[in-house]
């Protein structure tokens, strides 16, 4: 590995974000991805053990849930103010010279350093045109997360040196303190430290505020009537979930109810796997009922006319009077016969169809 290899340009791909902006990914070629992965397998065991224990993102044996649990513990200890820092376009603004300088302090192989530099300098292709890249380490390549941790670790160490309690996941960092005044001091410190790295804080998304109700990795903390600190799915994450379900259960396309459920299943189970850490059983029940409500509407549309609805409901064991009333009100079932339909198309009915549940 003498560092003479020249990587190909990465392909730009824009991923829409909930706020309407785009997250820019740089997708490397198959060959470059393999080389980056091999490089990662060599570097990660050497570098990862040097990182702060408060860093959780893209590290072996660490997950987002660990960062959320750490945040919960800090708040339980009485650190009720959070310094929530959002870095503006972090991966796009990484300074190459500063990053390479920090990497040299951990890796003394000249060939490796040259190869990493070559990947940083590789152009980015957009619409068939290759543009030179002077800064940034685009998301999409295997090396980018490790390099991000290399750059940000010195900020972690400064916070540790001052005795702060914090959790960082990639460029998302929350510091927990006991007072607003202490939080303002920490924010000023972080501005100085990030400025030295030529990184910018997104002031509109950063704040010194109450730790309760502040979104962190899709979760937020809340206090019960017994003063217990618990975890919940953030409101924005719930709304994003519902929006995705709306897309997956759109009533057009001619799909059977079984096909709709099959399309729904991977997303719901994946979402449940991530947010299963939340301590909000009532939210799960509410979202489950909301999903079943949409599925009932789809089922009625598939049955189309009143006679088919009547026949299908009878086949499911509904009393004739109930089936007749639902069929007669099929266009206004939500207002006139919602509870009757719920008594037929029950939770057990959707369980038999394989519909996943959150609760």
What are these regions (language model features)?
Residues 3-14, 18, 50-62, 66-213:
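Conserved polymerase palm-domain catalytic core
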Residues 30-31, 35-38, 72:
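Duplex nucleic acid-engaging cores and interfaces of nucleic-acid transaction enzymes
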Residues 121, 191-192, 196-263, 267-269:
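A conserved non-catalytic segment of reverse transcriptases
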Residues 132-136, 230, 246-260, 271-283, ...:
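Short, solvent-exposed helix-loop connector elements
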Residues 294, 303-359:
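Extended C-terminal regions of large enzymes
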């Amino acid at each position: 590995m003498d560092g003479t290899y020249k990587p190909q340009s990465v392909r730009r791909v824009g991923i829409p974000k909930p706020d309407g902006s785009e997250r820019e990914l740089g997708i490397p070629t198959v060959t470059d991805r393999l080389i980056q992965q091999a490089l990662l397998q060599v570097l990660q065991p050497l570098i990862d053990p040097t990182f702060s224990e408060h860093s959780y993102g893209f590290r072996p044996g660490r997950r987002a849930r660990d960062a959320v649990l750490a945040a919960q513990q800090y708040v339980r200890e009485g650190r009720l103010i959070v310094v929530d820092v959002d870095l503006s376009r972090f991966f796009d603004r990484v300074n190459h010279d500063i990053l390479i300088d920090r990497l040299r302090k951990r890796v003394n192989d000249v060939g490796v350093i040259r190869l990493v530099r070559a990947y940083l300098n590789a152009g980015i292709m957009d619409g068939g045109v290759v543009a030179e890249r002077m800064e940034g380490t685009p998301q999409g390549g295997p090396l980018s997360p490790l390099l991000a941790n290399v750059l940000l670790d010195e900020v972690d160490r400064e916070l540790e040196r001052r005795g702060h309690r914090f959790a960082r996941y990639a460029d998302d960092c929350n510091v927990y303190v006991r007072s607003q005044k202490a939080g303002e001091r920490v924010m000023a410190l972080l501005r100085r430290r990030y400025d030295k790295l030529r990184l910018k804080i997104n002031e509109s998304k950063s704040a010194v505020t109450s730790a309760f109700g502040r979104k962190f990795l899709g979760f937020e903390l809340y206090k019960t009537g017994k003063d217990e600190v618990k975890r919940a799915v953030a409101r924005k994450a719930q709304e994003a979930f519902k929006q995705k379900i709306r897309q997956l259960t759109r009533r057009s396309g001619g799909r059977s109810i079984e096909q709709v459920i099959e399309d729904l299943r991977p997303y719901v189970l994946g979402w449940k796997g991530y947010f299963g850490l939340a301590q909000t059983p009532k939210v799960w029940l509410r979202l489950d009922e909301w999903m079943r409500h949409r599925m009932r509407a789809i089922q009625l549309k598939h049955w189309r006319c009143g006679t088919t609805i009547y026949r299908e409901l009878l086949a499911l064991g509904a009393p004739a009077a109930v089936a007749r009333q639902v069929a007669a009100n099929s266009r206004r079932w939500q207002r006139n016969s919602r509870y009757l339909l719920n008594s037929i198309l029950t939770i057990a009915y959707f369980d038999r169809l394989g519909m996943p549940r959150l609760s």
